[in-house]
UniProtKB/Swiss-Prot annotation:
Signal peptide, first to last residue: 1-31
Gene name, Swiss-Prot/TrEMBL: F
Organism lineage string: Viruses, Riboviria, Orthornavirae, Negarnaviricota, Haploviricotina
Region ranges (Fusion peptide): 117-141
Native source species: Newcastle disease virus (strain Beaudette C/45) (NDV)
Topology Cytoplasmic: residue spans: 522-553
Keyword Coiled coil: yes
BP GO annotations: fusion of virus membrane with host plasma membrane; symbiont entry into host cell
Disulfide pattern: C76-C199, C338-C347, C362-C370, C394-C399, C401-C424
Official protein name in the record: Fusion glycoprotein F0
Glycosylation-annotated residues: N85, N191, N366, N447, N471
């Protein structure tokens, strides 16, 4: 069963129109492409159209329980008709009394309305506790009191007609259709046939049909006998009461054939008994159906994740279960306000949540941006079928191909295996045999590997384990610090005192100064020595020249 829609904030139709107008201005939506995501363990299982609805339309069905037989055949069927009439009265009188008590629980005195219907409901509930849904249903029953009174004004004419479907409009505030499933049977079997039937055969046919209809009535009104405010009549129950004539009312209320099957599956079409008259055997039911607004270009895409293989173990992708897409905008869709059918999603309100850039990039086809959570559970789904093919994690389960026989192996580093009829016609997984008919074309990406950086911890147990590892690392670090402190304690504190350090620094500076002065002095002496050598060399050369000049003379 799908989740029940929220009825706390009904959506006005003006809001529906505005939402539809805004969304219709956006460019057409493109579905999320599941081909690059399949090999990463993210499977697009399908799309559904998104609709917004409010339960605002009502109409009435007047079920004619007692058929009118042709005058010449009344005597033949008198015995089964009398028995049927007595059984009907016994079966439905508690229902009629309950309806009457609730409708009469609101009286007008002195111009003020005295609301006493809650006490009436509690009196009709076996447990003595009235829920909010029961109070709401009783309030709707009280509001339909005037319409029920108008129908009773016309009960004689409705009971006298031989038509199986008759539209009643005289003095009624809403559309009402009188239908008679048994009258339809009488018309088909007796009024439109030229064959003369014997009296005994007429009695037998009428008796059998009346008994079958009584069985249907008992099935429909079993939970309703005590209090009509407890349970609504489903669309299936309404069809049992009215037969195929139910379509006439729905068509009159504007339900098209293209929406009918989807609305029937949604359970949004319901009915509440509003009157029962034992004199004419008329049963009035108020039918409520939604007013639906289609949101153009808006669809809901359903995603499922598969446990994939990584170097850090098995993991599943962190993506929303349902996303909605309008144009290039992708957001997570909250379906708690919606009712699901096979093809449609009916919501009382549209609630979406923005996604992180990483998830958006992942769903757009960039599988390297996908994040995964470790899933070590043995019951984690290791395979999934899609369009006649299988996506399986052949490291978690044995992928045995029956035809042709063999074991399908998954290469190291591959997240999952894509198996179609090209690689295996008949596949056996955990004792389940599947005949494959689909095929993964070349557009499907394969051999995708999940990096270590893409696997994160999200589960409570895994987080506890990681916290334990962190605590162990911290303990090891503290032990190392204690060892270093013990080694520092062995060092001579006097040598590392502040005054000693200052002395060392001053002596070092003095040594550097003396060293620099010595270097400068040495350079000066070397320079002076070289100058003296040059002077002596010059004097020697002059003396030698003078001696040569004296010798020549």
């Amino acid at each position: 069963m799908g989740p029940r829609p929220s009825t706390k904030n009904p959506v006005p139709m003006m809001l529906t129109v505005r939402v539809a107008l805004v969304l219709s201005c956006i460019c057409p939506a493109n579905s999320i492409d599941g081909r690059p995501l399949a090999a990463a363990g993210i499977v697009v299982t399908g799309d559904k159209a998104v609709n917004i609805y409010t339960s605002s339309q009502t109409g009435s069905i007047i079920v004619k329980l007692l058929p009118n037989l042709p005058k010449d055949k009344e005597a033949c069927a008198k015995a089964p008709l009398d028995a049927y009439n007595r059984t009907l009265t016994t079966l439905l009188t508690p229902l009629g009394d309950s309806i009457r008590r609730i409708q009469e629980s609101v009286t007008t005195s002195g111009g003020r309305r005295q609301k006493r219907f809650i006490g009436a409901i509690i009196g009709g509930v076996a447990l003595g506790v009235a829920t909010a849904a029961q109070i709401t249903a009783a309030a709707a029953l009280i509001q339909a009191k005037q319409n029920a009174a108008n129908i009773l004004r016309l009960k004689e004419s409705i009971a006298a007609t031989n038509e199986a479907v008759h539209e009643v409009t005289d003095g009624l505030s809403q559309l009402a259709v009188a239908v008679g499933k048994m009258q339809q049977f009488v018309n088909d079997q007796f009024n439109k046939t030229a064959q003369e039937l014997g009296c005994i055969r007429i009695a037998q046919q009428v008796g059998v049909e009346l008994n079958l209809y009584l069985t249907e009535l008992t099935t429909v009104f079993g939970p309703q006998i005590t209090s009509p405010a407890l349970n609504k009549l489903t669309i299936q129950a309404l069809y049992n009461l009215a037969g195929g004539n139910m379509d006439y009312l729905l068509t009159k209320l504007g339900v098209g054939n293209n929406q009918l099957s989807s609305l029937i599956g949604s359970g949004l079409i319901t009915g509440n008994p509003i009157l029962y008259d034992s004199q004419t055997q008329l049963l009035g039911i108020q039918v409520t159906l939604p007013s639906v607004g289609n949101l153009n270009n808006m669809r809901a895409t359903y995603l499922e994740t598969l446990s994939v293989s990584t170097t850090r173990g098995f993991a599943s992708a962190l993506v929303p279960k349902v996303v909605t897409q309008v144009g290039s905008v992708i957001e997570e869709l909250d379906t708690s306000y919606c009712i699901e059918t096979d093809l449609d999603l009916y919501c009382t309100r549209i609630v979406t949540f923005p996604m992180s850039p990483g998830i958006y990039s992942c769903l757009s086809g960039n599988t390297s941006a996908c994040m995964y959570s470790k899933t070590e559970g043995a019951l984690t789904t290791p395979y999934m079928t899609i369009k006649g093919s299988v996506i399986a994690n052949c490291k978690m389960t044995t992928c045995r191909c029956v035809n042709p026989p063999g074991i399908i192996s998954q290469n190291y580093g591959e997240a999952v295996s894509l198996i179609d009829k090209q690689s295996c016609n008949v596949l056996s997984l955990d004792g389940i045999t599947l005949r494959l008919s689909g095929e993964f074309d070349a557009t499907y990406q394969k051999n995708i590997s999940i990096q270590d950086s893409q696997v994160i911890i999200t589960g409570n147990l895994d987080i506890s384990t990681e916290l334990g590892n962190v605590n162990n690392s911290i303990s090891n670090a503290l032990n190392k610090l204690e060892e270093s402190n013990s080694k520092l304690d062995k060092v001579n504190v006097k040598l590392t005192s502040t005054s000693a350090l200052i002395t060392y620094i001053v002596l070092t500076i003095i040594s550097l100064v003396f060293g620099i002065l010595s270097l400068v002095l040495a350079c000066y002496l070397m320079y002076k020595q070289k100058a003296q050598q040059k002077t002596l060399l010059w004097l020697g050369n002059n003396t030698l020249d003078q001696m040569r000049a004296t010798t020549k003379m």
